[in-house]
Amino acid sequence: MTKVSVPSNEVTKAAHRKLEERGVTLADIADIVYQMQFPYNNSLTLEDCLESVRKVLLKREIQHAILVGVELDQLAERKMLSEPLQSIVASDEGLFGVDETIALGAALGYGSIAVTTFGHLDKNKIGIIQKLDTKEGGSVHTFLDDIVASIAANASSRLAHRLRDLEEGRPLEERLEVEGEELIG
């Protein structure tokens, strides 16, 4: 088997395209981030949230979660999974935790704030997550609703840490170094 390396920019574009194809905009996710973080930072703007979502979506782990999750959702819509997995994914069975496991794994890189925020979003289904969780028109979003929650949780955590850095007067050079380290993985 020949090892094939897919260029990062292709993976990034594919992940963005999958979100768009499934009706999820970056603004939808930024709105959730705003709702999560505004109580802790009243100078927060939607543009800050959108920028944080964009940064989170640069991480390969997030991109891979999007690609895998959406692919499985689409296969379930086309009834192309074998049983009993087909029925489990198509119905978003309550005891099927693989969707949450993938999304939670994607949140682990952003620490405890991301993990607890993910749990909150998974339980309360805010914004576009609620729309995705509602089974209408034959669409399956078993994985995507949780992945969107993970992206929003990560962007929220990222903003919380940036706020602390600013409050403590952390130099721009150090903040940019942390920014670069976040893109690993």
Language-model segments: residues:
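Short, surface-exposed, charged/polar-biased interaction segments
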Residues: 36, 40, 50, 70, ...
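A near-ubiquitous, low-amplitude feature marking generic local secondary-structure context
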Residues: 2-3, 12, 16, 87, ...
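Intrinsic-disorder-associated interaction segments
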Residues: 4, 8, 22, 42, ...
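Glycine-rich, aromatic-bearing surface loops/beta-hairpins
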Residues: 118-185
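Long, charge-patterned amphipathic interaction tracts in eukaryotic proteins
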Residues: 48-123
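N-terminal interaction modules that seed assembly of large macromolecular complexes
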Residues: 6-73
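Short, hydrophobic/amphipathic alpha-helical patches that form generic packing surfaces
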Residues: 31-35, 68, 102-113, 146-154
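Internal, hydrophobic cores of structured domains that mediate oligomerization or house catalytic pockets
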Residues: 2-12, 114, 119
